[in-house]
A protein has these predicted regions:
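Membrane-embedded helix-loop-helix hairpins and adjacent transmembrane boundary segments
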Residues: 1-487
Length: 487
């Protein structure tokens, strides 16, 4: 117990000290606070994008899902997340250009600059904030899991403590501090996750022995195949979900705006798929192997499988050290989410005449409390919370892509697209049985299938409304992708 306190306490203190050091050249203006002066080069952009995207969902959600589903979850996450580099590249360069053109730091600000529509800006910002709250709740939920595994106390204590810590250093240093702590926490998380995998595999007698044990049991043999888990439609839907949802994460969009150049975005997109495999392989293998030791965990309880396995094989000292990987992953995402979502509220939703410093700080604190409350009182699993947020994000993609690439998009088309797409997402969440007879019921593993009808509705709303208001003015949907340096 005492050694665990030393490890976690030392890590928390180190992050606060590092954040204070990292703010040494922080300016007071929004561009410095939210975009680090648009100075992120290729290597730093890659590290901060990866550390921000690989969150509690990566460590605990994917290990819990692989416990229930098996190794078929590995290509779903590793290939799917890596594949999103395509959309990051196609959209990222145009986002950066429009961001500079309009002085925009968020997607709704860019849409406002392109369409001149305050209604479109407010609609998009409101939905993005609402979508981020469930995803924000993943991080304190996972912090509670780590705290419980280390100290045996209730989950909510760990959730509260980590939320306080992250809010403290986010308010201290803005994006520059967040990016610099991302680099440290990303390296810590990746290194310790691989150490944890080596410990679990060694305890199981080697990877071949573990896989043989899984395949030889009637209760676990299904963990090595995709039968009953991922049909072709579910697999394709999940790939589409990652492709369109991830660039819409406010914290990832913010980093594309903060890139130093188009070449930096190209280098990041080129290397990102390799980093995705390195990040997802350890937790998914640990979750699958964990079924041998703990065969009867329920859906929410399976999110605990990674810390449980690590503590079993590593003991208090080494196990506690490896569990810091989970803390590093969730903290490197939570700080970015708070900062990016705070910029949505202060720059898109609040009155520009409000006192800037008070608004920035109070909004970040309020968002952290909302996420904390949802994490403590909701009984949804980490995977459930993540899929809900992803589905809401994906609907934004057509409007953002169209607004970035065309100068004459009507703001009413953006509003229609968002409302139509989100209506389908809401239907999938609250009335999945409505999809019976004409589509796949979006429940459990089939939740991602809702992305196809929701994107279709969003595209239809965008195109039909745009056609009605703008085609008489000679608008054309001609879409061009210009060549750019990748390396």
């Amino acid at each position: 117990m005492s050694s665990a306190w030393v490890i976690v306490g030392g890590y928390a203190l180190a992050m606060v000290i590092f954040a204070i050091w990292a703010r040494r050249d922080l300016g007071r203006e929004d561009e410095s606070c939210y975009l680090a002066g648009r100075s992120l080069t290729g290597p730093i952009l890659l590290v901060t994008m990866a550390a921000t995207n690989f969150s509690a969902f990566t460590v605990y959600g994917s290990s819990g899902a692989s416990y229930r589903i098996g190794l078929s979850f590995l290509p779903i996450m590793a290939f799917g997340t890596g594949f999103m580099a395509v959309s990051m590249y196609i959209l990222g360069r145009k986002i950066r250009s429009r961001s500079v053109q309009h002085g925009a730091m968020t997607a709704p600000e860019m849409v406002m600059g392109q369409t001149g529509s305050r209604s479109a800006q407010l609609t998009m910002a409101s939905v993005l904030v609402l979508a981020t709250i469930p995803y924000l709740a993943l991080q304190p939920r996972a912090a509670g899991i780590v705290f419980s595994a280390l100290f045996g106390g209730p989950d909510w204590i760990g959730a509260v403590l980590v939320t306080l810590l992250v809010v403290a250093y986010t308010l201290t240093g803005g994006l520059k501090a967040v990016v610099r702590t991302d680099a440290v926490q990303g390296a810590i998380a990746l290194g310790l996750l691989w150490l944890g995998l080596a410990m679990v595999v060694n305890d199981a007698g080697g990877i071949s022995s573990a896989m043989d044990a899984i395949s030889s049991s009637e209760n676990t043999e299904g963990l090595l195949g995709r039968e009953g888990n991922y049909t072709l439609l579910i697999w394709v839907s999940t790939m589409i979900l990652w492709l369109f949802a991830d660039p819409m994460f406010p914290q990832l969009y913010q980093r594309l705006c903060a890139a130093e150049s188009d070449a930096a975005i190209g280098r990041m997109a080129t290397l990102y798929p390799a980093v995705a495999w390195l990040a997802f392989l350890p937790p998914i293998l640990i979750g699958t192997i964990g079924h041998l030791s703990y065969p009867d965990l329920d859906r929410a309880g399976s999110d605990n499988i990674l810390p449980t396995m690590i503590m079993d094989v590593g003991g208090e000292w080494l196990g506690g050290l490896v569990l810091v990987a989970g803390l590093a992953a969730l903290m490197s995402t939570m700080d970015s989410q708070l900062l990016a979502t705070g910029s949505l509220v202060t720059r898109d939703l609040l009155d520009k005449e409000s006192p800037e410093d008070w608004s920035r700080e109070s909004v970040i604190i309020s968002l952290s409390l909302l996420g904390l409350a949802l994490s403590v009182w909701s009984d949804l699993s980490i995977l459930d919370l993540g899929l809900l947020a992803f589905s809401m994000y994906a609907v934004m993609f057509p409007s953002v892509l169209a607004s970035a690439h065309f100068d004459d998009i009507d703001g009413r088309a953006v509003v229609a697209s968002i409302l139509a797409g989100e209506a389908v997402v809401i239907l999938a969440v609250f009335s999945p049985e409505s999809f019976n007879g004409w589509w796949v019921e979006p429940v459990r593993g089939a939740v991602p299938t809702a992305v196809i009808p929701s994107l279709f509705a969003a595209l239809a709303g965008l195109v039909v409304t745009q056609h009605y208001f703008k085609m008489r003015e000679g608008f054309s949907w001609r879409f061009e992708i210009n060549n750019s340096d990748i390396v």
